[in-house]
Every structure is written in structure tokens, then in C-alpha cells.
Amino acid sequence: MRLLRGVYEGPGSHGILRVAASMKGVHAVLRALPGEGYFPALYGARERTGEAAPVSLSPLSERAEDSWGPGNLARDLSSVVRRHPETEAVILARSEAALLSDEEIPEVSFPEEGGRAPKLVTCNWENPGVGEVEAADLALEDLVRAHARGRRERSPSPTANLFGPPVFGPGAAAEYAEAERLLAMVGVGVNTRVPLGASVGDLGRLSGAWVNVLLYREVGESATLYLQDEFGMQRVTTPMVGAAGTGAALRTIGELCHLDPKKVQQAVWAELARTAKLPWYARLYRPETFRERRVAIFGDFTYPLGLGYALSREVGLEVAACGTYLGHLERDFLFHAHTFTDEAFVEDDPEEVAARIEASDPDLVVGTHLEEGVADSLGVPFLPLCPPVVRSTFVQRPLMGYTGSSVLADALDGGLGLMEVEPEPVEAAGMPWTGEAREELAQTPPFLRGRARRLAEDRARELGSTEVTREIFLGSRR
């Protein structure tokens, strides 16, 4: 047994709870040990909405078989509808302890409210090997299967379903808002946003949209594939990260919605001129900042791939390594990542990830909060742009879309600015430096080298020396 310094994702039950907490009218029952009911506290601390998480705990403990006290699963499922009459769907999540107990799921019938009884979604695919992200994806598919009705007539004007991240996703609400703004810009409305903020009734209206836009493939993959097979709904999977990726996604949406390509292109150009800072940043910044710079990227799926495309093709950085911790998406990830890097990998052990990053010898690390220590040990800048991240800001900013490209440009400016190469320490008057003095100057942080050089040369003039030696350089710093 080995002690890990962290994990990238939680158990499958946590993914189910995240999806349930993202939606309206859905209540989750967590079958787990009494000490595992931490989700409501985590939800309150992260979301800050003032509302309780729609999660109830059914404690797993020894009791008489005919007991109807707390912990009886059938009773706990039935009581949810009684205590929360607004519930339209109940989803059952089981912890690893509950799964290993191998108890049977009871048959429960809910009373009708307003002529309609809530549905019970049991997630029969659960097993200890399914992680948080995959479980969230499968849980959303189960909810869509249970509530998506027959093929509805398409809306008169073009509309799209947005499938994005659930709660706890960094900047999740901001990502939806940016995508909705961009779709409105090209003349496409939003039919519904799934799962964040969607109601059970919204799931029944999914088939009325013209296209499904997959912002976050990790959670919407299975649901959109079901809608594609069942109702023939086409989907757009291009990551909206960076200016080029956003433009490609908008043009694809325009084609599927039969929009005028010239108007779509005009809208894209307008955003490039008005909002997107990344292309301008890449062209107007000093070339030395990007030349032969290597970046290592690690995260979930959408963000590492989107950032890999943007940093390699728009900024000009060399992607030394790109990896994910999602083993169930390994084939798709490697297929896409190999288009911009030779070193693509799948790994969920933080120590192995650290070793991979160190071996790639990067100048910049982009990843989850677990990669910050690796960047510190290498002495290179770190950008926490891929989930999971522990920093939760009050003001959410998107990383997708043209607004997100400006956020990315600002982050790169802060990170790469510390790596700017100072010119060789040569004074206008021609004062030379010894080799040892140059080596000492090279060990000075880049943003302090200019001042250190001037102080050393002033000190040499005061001492009447014709060159800057190691002793003069060290003496000038006192």
C-alpha cells in the first residue's frame, strides 16, 4: 500500500451527486456509511448560494430486516418525495461501502403529484471501478433517457442545447454564459443548458433543438450520443478554448443550423477585433518570450486538449507533454493530443504525472492544483487552468470562448513574463564581465537582472575596476 499526496477525482457517487445538485427538481439519495455524508457541507462551501444541497443520506448500518427506522433504503427513498414535494426525479447514489455490501435495490413507487409521479433512477451500472467524472457522465445519460420524450418538432428558429460542466466545475456558470453569448451573436438561441440549471421538464424538451453543443465532453458525451442515436440530433464537440477553437466551433454550428456563412464569419472577425486578446498577444509580444519555450499540460479532457491546440498553434509554444487522468477516455484523448505533441499520456497517479512532467523539461506547467508542487520544484511558472483546482474565486471568469481567450492571454502574460530573457550584461561604455560574474548574474531571477547588472557596474566604477568580477557583483548586492 502506498500513500498518495492527492487524487484527481473522487468516487463515482460524488459524480452522481454533482449532477443531481446541478439540476432543478432532482433529489439524490446517497446510500453510504454515516461518516460519508459530507457532500452538503462541501456544496455550501463551494457554491455559496445559500440553498441546501438536494442530497439526503441513507445510512448503511446493521438493523433488523423489518425495521423502518433510519437506514431502511425503501423508507428513505419514499420519504424524499414526502419531505421535498417539488422533487420530480430521485436518483440513487451508492458509496463504495454500499456497493461492496451487495444489497438489492428495493422497488419503490412514488405517489402522484399533479397527475405525475417522480421517477426513480437507480444507476445500475455503478461499481467501485467507475470514477467521479465517468459516473457523472453516465448519471446524466440515465436522467436524459428517463425524461427525454419522443421526437419533438424543431423550434422555428435555430436553437442549441448546451452540455457543459456540473457544479464544482471551475467557472462553470461563466462558461455557459460565454457560450450563450457567442451563440446569440451568430443568431442561435439556447434551448436548454444541461446539467447546470436544467429542470426535469427541460430534459423533455431536448429533442426540440437543432444541434447539441458539447462544451464539456467529460459529462455530456454519453447523453449527446444517446440523443444522436435516438433522435438523429447532430453534435459539435470542438473545444471552445482559444480563438481558433472557438471560431471553428461557431462555424460548425452555423453549418448545422443552416446559417449564412458570411454573417457567421463577420461575427467571428468582430469578436477577434473586439474581445479576443490571445491572437494579438501572441503577435505583439516579444518573440523571445515564446521561441523554443516548452509547456507541459495535464488535466481532465476538454481543457488540456483545448489549451494544447491554443498554445501550440496560436501562441507558438512547444507542447512537451500533454496528459489526462481519465482512463475511460484514453483512446480519444491520445488521438487528439498526438496532433500537437509527441508525448501524450494517460495517468492517474500524481507521482507518475510529476515524473512525466519533470522528464519533459518544461518552461511552463499548466495543470491541476496537484501539479503546482512539480512546477515549484522545477522553478518554472505554473498556471492552474485544468480541473480539479482548489482555488475558488468569488468572480467567475470563463476560459472558453473569446472572453476566455483574453483570460488565457492574461494568465500567460503573468506566467511567461517571469521567463523573459534579459539581454547579455554588456554596458554601453563597453565594461566587460568575467565568466564567474556572468554565472552569478544568470542565477538572479530574470525580473531582477537589469537592476543587478546596473548596481554591479556602478560598484565597479566606484572601485576603479575596468571589469565586473564575481567579488564586485556579490559586493554590490549587500
Which residues does each PLM region occupy?
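Non-catalytic accessory segments flanking P-loop/AAA+ NTPase cores
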Residues: E424-R478
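An N-terminal assembly and electron-transfer interface module characteristic of large anaerobic redox
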Residues: M1-G430
